[in-house]
């Protein structure tokens, strides 16, 4: 009980700060302060003083929400400060706050992508907001192309490591507070403990995920390059969110659904509708893994063997500025 109270206090201090009224990533903006203000509004809208877990549903995986207990009208995320409308296929700016296996869980029905013309800070704003609201565990799901020929359509793969080939980072230019290091250790970016929990729930593979900037698909030469670099999967999302979450001390689980063969001898022309269809068919399997992992978490949403880290990097005064609508 004492540990739970202490961990909640670590995140409860994220409740006040003055922030600029510019969008995340804009000159002069403090994205951490903006996340705190959005978290306060999230608490007001949901009636939940804190959240333990964040689950982000990728392309075509919105059906997993039903299997995770989402019901009733979702929250309109665009009504939260600095949340932009998702425009990717199969993504909706909606969320549900649910009790999942005894943990208060925020389920988000999509995400922003860099290819939508958004800054890295805008892309990771939902993740930072959930962590400011108390989430210690972040589950990121996505659809991906198979670089490794051993993978089959519909497979659920736990992300073991990643290649960030976007040429950018959500930490660039934003980390000036001494509470958190600018140079974050990414050795265990994808929690080994959470991956072990996922494998205990279902027989799933692990793999290395490469993020390309998109929106164009990869060329055969690029896929050969990715294979040579050790990638098993390729997609256009997820890595910035993982970086941002690790920077703030949260534990991250990544689950990728193989929705197509990447460019090469096995691949035909990609039909986005087909990607959504394949992902949708794997939604129950993804939900099963997520629910099983969350069931094994302690009451504050962190695995029992998780590392306890310093408080997230935020700065600002004690007075809160009214957020723009």
What are the functions of these language-model segments?
Residues 2-186:
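Metabolite-binding pocket within alpha/beta catalytic cores that recognizes anionic/polar moieties
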Residues 130-134, 227, 246:
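Non-catalytic positions within long, well-ordered alpha-helices that form the structural scaffold/packing
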Residues 195-196, 200-232, 290, 297-300:
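Active-site/ligand-binding-proximal alpha/beta "capping" segment
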């Amino acid at each position: 009980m004492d540990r739970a109270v202490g961990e909640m206090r670590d995140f409860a201090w994220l409740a006040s700060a003055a922030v600029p009224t510019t969008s995340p990533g804009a000159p002069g903006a403090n994205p951490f302060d903006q996340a705190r203000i959005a978290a306060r509004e999230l608490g007001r809208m949901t009636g939940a003083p804190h959240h333990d877990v964040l689950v982000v549903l990728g392309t075509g995986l919105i059906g997993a929400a039903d299997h995770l207990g989402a019901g009733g009208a979702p929250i309109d995320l665009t009504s939260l400060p600095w949340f932009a409308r998702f425009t990717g296929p199969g993504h909706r700016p909606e969320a549900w706050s649910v009790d999942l296996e005894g943990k208060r869980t925020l389920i988000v029905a999509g995400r922003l992508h860099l290819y939508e013309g958004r800054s890295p800070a805008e892309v990771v704003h939902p993740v930072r907001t959930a962590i400011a609201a108390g989430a210690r565990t972040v589950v990121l799901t996505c659809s991906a192309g198979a670089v490794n020929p051993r993978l089959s359509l519909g497979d659920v793969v736990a992300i073991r490591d990643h290649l960030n080939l976007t040429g950018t980072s959500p930490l660039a230019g934003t980390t000036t507070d001494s509470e958190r290091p600018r140079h974050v250790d990414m050795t265990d970016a994808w929690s080994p403990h959470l991956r072990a929990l996922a494998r205990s729930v279902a027989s799933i593979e692990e793999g290395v995920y490469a993020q390309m900037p998109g929106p164009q698909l990869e060329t055969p030469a690029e896929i050969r390059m990715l294979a040579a670099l050790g990638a098993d999967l390729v997609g256009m999302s997820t890595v910035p969110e993982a970086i941002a979450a690790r920077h703030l001390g949260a534990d991250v689980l990544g689950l990728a659904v193989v929705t197509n063969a990447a460019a090469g001898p096995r691949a035909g022309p990609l039909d986005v509708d087909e990607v959504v269809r394949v992902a949708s068919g794997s939604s129950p399997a993804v939900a099963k893994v997520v629910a099983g992992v969350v069931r094994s978490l302690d009451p504050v949403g962190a695995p029992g063997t998780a590392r306890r880290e310093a408080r997230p990097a935020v700065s600002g005064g004690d007075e809160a500025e009214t957020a723009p609508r």
